[in-house]
Amino acid sequence: MPQWFFQGGVAMYPLLLCSVVGLAIILERIWSLRRSRVIAPTLEKLIDAMPASGDGHEKVKAFSGGDRTVLGELIRAVFNHAAMAKHENVEAVQAIARQIVGRLERGLTTLSIVAEISPLLGLLGTCSGMVKLFVDVSQHGLGEPAQISRGIFEALIATVTGLAVAIPALVAHMYLRRRVELLVLEMERYTNELLARLYR
């Protein structure tokens, strides 16, 4: 660990934990939310090319049966409930879609907490450092200006670290949440398109 880490006080340890947790979530979500893992390009093309009747339905059904993407899961749900009335099928698929959205958003709440709590932890570290500095001044006097400056520097390390953890976490949270929204909208479009063609 660099020397400045230990100079920042006890708040640096929870900030280190926040940074590790935040980075792990960001990397995992970026990997999991790749478009190819959520929406298979082949399945997209099959749905777009699917006629109102004929073997196009069977091609989509056959491909989705072995497709491990999230869209494939939704499409299988549509076909699994195809014997139902359209509104019943829609309700069943919507219930599954809510579970899928929850999976896509996994970890984002924790990432939001990291972004919100890190500056507060930094501020706590700074406040505790300033209290320690004032206690030292009250007991030993002002001393050398360099000593006072060093004490203030050490107190501010925690705030700087808290912001350094919070800002990337906040940006990543906003980006990942927006990515989930766009992927969900796209999957909704393909699902609605399939439902419309199945129930013509």
Locations of the language-model features?
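Residue-level signature of catalytic and energy-coupling elements of molecular machines
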Residues: 9, 23, 60, 75, ...
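Membrane-interfacial hairpin junctions
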Residues: 3, 137-139, 145-150
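Hydrophobic alpha-helical transmembrane segments of polytopic membrane proteins
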Residues: 153-171
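Hydrophobic membrane-targeting segments
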Residues: 1-44
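Hydrophobic alpha-helical transmembrane segments of integral membrane proteins
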Residues: 15, 111-119, 144, 148-155, ...
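Predominantly long cytosolic amphipathic alpha-helical stalk/bundle segments
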Residues: 38-124, 128-142, 172-200
